[in-house]
């Protein structure tokens, strides 16, 4: 029976910052938040911190977000390695064009033992889960049968890598949308804020909403001042949403 895959989001990279030694400025933050502040102050050469309300990094970044000076947020980035996510969910994810992606290739990686991601609407129903996993098993059996026949069909292809690729890219047509995929996603702070505003909404599909909220929690640990305006709440159905009055970019 097909194994199910839980969502897992792992932080794998974040911006470092090296302050220029010839600039008369210090800050109480490091990494991406420090870089964002530096970029903002570079616009106005406000190294002396003339405004007490923006003298701290948190105060400065909150002001940046309040006034909509979002371009400076684009200098700092975070990368996640995401597993336990369905192919149907990544079809929505990759519509966010300001991110960079590197995704598992079904042309090079065989899917005979691929896991499935249970849609949120089926998680609490054993009968529905059983129907789903049976369908996934049938699809994988058909995939394996097609793969064997396609490899035989392309047996005259002398390049073994190309032969297997040709077979897999045709056989994958029968794999379900619930098939697990794995993907590296990199985005700058502005892009992540936009993603969360769009996909942590109650109007988003629950699977990608869960992804957005888990990313938000980890982003808030990396750059609290940049993401602190988002509030996570629970709806009547038990699912979570995240909203912010300052997330103004549609």
Curated annotation (Swiss-Prot):
GO biological process: dTMP biosynthetic process; dTTP biosynthetic process; methylation
Consequence when changing residue 165 to A: Loss of catalytic activity since it is not able to complement an E.coli thyA deletion mutant
Flavoprotein keyword on record: yes
Ligand binding (FAD): 71, 95-97, 103, 188-190, 194
Domain ThyX: 7-233
Pathway(s) it belongs to: Pyrimidine metabolism; dTTP biosynthesis
Induction annotation: Is expressed under the exponential phase of growth, and down-regulated upon starvation. Expression of thyX is significantly increased within murine macrophages or under acid stress. Is expressed at a lower level than thyA under all of the in vitro and in vivo growth conditions tested.
Chain sites annotated for binding dUMP: 87, 92-95, 103-107, 172, 199
Cofactor(s) the protein requires to work: FAD
Active site (UniProt): 199
UniProt keyword Transferase, yes or no: yes
Phenotypic consequence of residue 175 to M: Still able to complement an E.coli thyA deletion mutant
GO molecular function: flavin adenine dinucleotide binding; NADPH binding; thymidylate synthase (FAD) activity; thymidylate synthase activity
Result after altering residue 108 to F: Still able to complement an E.coli thyA deletion mutant
Keywords recorded for this protein, A-Z: FAD, Flavoprotein, Methyltransferase, NADP, Nucleotide biosynthesis, Transferase
Highest taxon above the source species: Bacteria
Enzyme nomenclature, EC number: 2.1.1.148
Reaction equation(s) it catalyzes: dUMP + (6R)-5,10-methylene-5,6,7,8-tetrahydrofolate + NADPH + H(+) = dTMP + (6S)-5,6,7,8-tetrahydrofolate + NADP(+)
Motif (ThyX motif) on chain: 95-105
Further information: Was identified as a high-confidence drug target. Crystallographic studies have shown that NADPH/NADP(+) binding expels both FAD and dUMP from the active site, by competing for the binding site. However, the location of NADPH binding might not be biologically relevant.
NCBIfam families in the cross-refs: thyX
Stated role: Catalyzes the reductive methylation of 2'-deoxyuridine-5'-monophosphate (dUMP) to 2'-deoxythymidine-5'-monophosphate (dTMP) while utilizing 5,10-methylenetetrahydrofolate (mTHF) as the methyl donor, and NADPH and FADH(2) as the reductant. Is essential for growth of the pathogen on solid media in vitro; the essential function is something other than dTMP synthase.
Family the entry assigns: Belongs to the thymidylate synthase ThyX family.
PANTHER family registered for this protein in UniProt: FLAVIN-DEPENDENT THYMIDYLATE SYNTHASE (PTHR34934:SF1)
Protein name in the entry: Flavin-dependent thymidylate synthase
Organism encoding this protein: Mycobacterium tuberculosis (strain ATCC 25618 / H37Rv)
């Amino acid at each position: 029976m097909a194994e199910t895959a839980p969502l897992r989001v792992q932080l794998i990279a974040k911006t470092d910052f090296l302050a220029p030694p010839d600039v008369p400025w210090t800050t109480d933050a490091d990494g991406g938040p420090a870089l964002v502040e530096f970029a903002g102050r570079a616009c106005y050469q406000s190294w002396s911190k003339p405004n007490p309300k923006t003298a701290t990094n948190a105060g400065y970044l909150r002001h940046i977000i309040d006034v909509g000076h979002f371009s400076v947020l684009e200098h700092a980035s975070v990368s996640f390695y995401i597993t336990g996510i369905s192919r149907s969910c990544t079809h929505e994810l990759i519509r966010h064009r300001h991110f960079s992606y590197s995704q598992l290739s079904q042309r090079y990686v065989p899917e005979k033992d691929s896991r499935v991601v249970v849609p949120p609407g089926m998680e609490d129903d054993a009968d529905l889960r059983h129907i789903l996993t049976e369908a996934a098993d049938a699809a994988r059996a058909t995939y394996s049968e097609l793969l064997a026949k396609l490899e035989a069909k392309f047996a005259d292809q002398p390049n073994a890598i190309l032969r297997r690729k040709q077979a897999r890219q045709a056989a994958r047509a029968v794999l379900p949308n619930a098939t697990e995929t794995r993907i590296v996603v990199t985005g700058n702070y502005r892009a992540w804020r936009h993603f969360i505003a769009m996909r942590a909404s109650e109007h988003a599909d629950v699977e990608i909403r869960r992804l957005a909220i888990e990313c938000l929690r980890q982003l808030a640990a990396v750059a609290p001042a940049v993401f602190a305006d988002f509030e996570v709440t629970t709806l009547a159905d038990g699912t979570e949403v995240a909203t912010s009055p300052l997330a103004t970019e549609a």
